[in-house]
């Protein structure tokens, strides 16, 4: 699998790119990537693209008009108030939430696949995992990266729908189901309610923040990249694939044969 960075011009034509090879690990019965894997991969990928820009155009890459982050959907990255990851990233590839998935399907009368973030959260609760009481934020991979680059806890609606069911009339999490979940876990006495710990769902074009000074240094280890670049809502690979193949118009569709 590769992490990819693509620079496009004002006509949406690719003009430079970079890549980094990475592979998930199977540790303690869980498919995962470490935070180090994530950031060394992103940084290496960005540098590869910056070198391509320098080689092709003899220009140092210092800013772009706008950018966004896309990554694998679903999964589970719970953080505490200090921003520390409480358990290793549980990716979409894990099938370890069968009990939670079944019970939530019954509760919501709605299909909840095992890979969805809400299934991971409820399974951790059913397992009696210590970390759940300390959760301050739950993210998917791109929600996490976007948060670190902008400070904003937001997620594009395509992958928000891979965390929890969406009310399509409101373009937001289904409030009736949110209430049912909060009621379901109330006996455990957690300090949080579900909406407190989930990223805000955004639709395309909404303000998702700008690259911060801290985020710029995280992305470009050489320090050349400038802060202040607007960022679009981060999205899952399915929605990104549809946009990239122009399959967003009515009566069009796309078939993914692997996301990379």
Mark where each language-model region is:
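Charged catalytic carboxylate motif
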Residues: 37, 41
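Glycine-rich phosphate-binding/catalytic subdomain of phosphoryl-transfer
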Residues: 32, 44-260
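Short glycine-rich, Thr/Ser-proximal phosphate-binding strand/loop in the N-terminal lobe
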Residues: 1-36, 84-91
């Amino acid at each position: 699998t590769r992490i990819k960075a693509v620079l496009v011009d004002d006509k949406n034509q690719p003009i430079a790119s970079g890549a980094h090879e990475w592979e998930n690990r199977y540790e303690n019965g869980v498919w995962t990537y470490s935070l180090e894997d994530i950031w060394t991969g992103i940084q290496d990928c960005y540098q590869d693209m910056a070198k391509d820009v320098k080689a092709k155009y003899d220009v140092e890459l210092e800013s772009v008009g706008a950018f966004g982050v896309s990554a694998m959907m679903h999964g589970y990255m719970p953080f505490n108030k200090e921003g520390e990851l409480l358990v290793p990233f549980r990716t979409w590839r894990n099938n370890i939430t069968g009990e939670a998935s079944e019970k939530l399907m019954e509760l919501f009368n709605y299909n909840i696949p095992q890979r969805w973030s809400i299934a991971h959260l409820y399974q951790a609760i059913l397992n009696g995992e210590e970390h759940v009481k300390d959760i301050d934020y739950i993210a998917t991979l791109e929600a996490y990266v976007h948060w670190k680059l902008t400070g904003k806890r937001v997620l594009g609606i395509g992958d928000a729908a891979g965390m929890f069911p969406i009310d399509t009339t409101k373009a937001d999490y289904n409030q009736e189901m949110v209430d049912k979940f909060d009621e379901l876990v109330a006996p455990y006495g957690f300090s949080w309610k579900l909406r407190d710990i989930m990223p805000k769902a955004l639709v395309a074009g909404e303000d998702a923040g700008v690259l911060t000074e801290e985020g710029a240094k995280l992305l470009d280890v050489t320090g050349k990249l400038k802060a202040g670049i607007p960022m679009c809502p981060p999205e899952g690979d399915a929605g990104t694939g549809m946009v990239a193949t122009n399959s967003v118009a009515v009566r069009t569709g796309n078939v993914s044969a692997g996301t990379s």
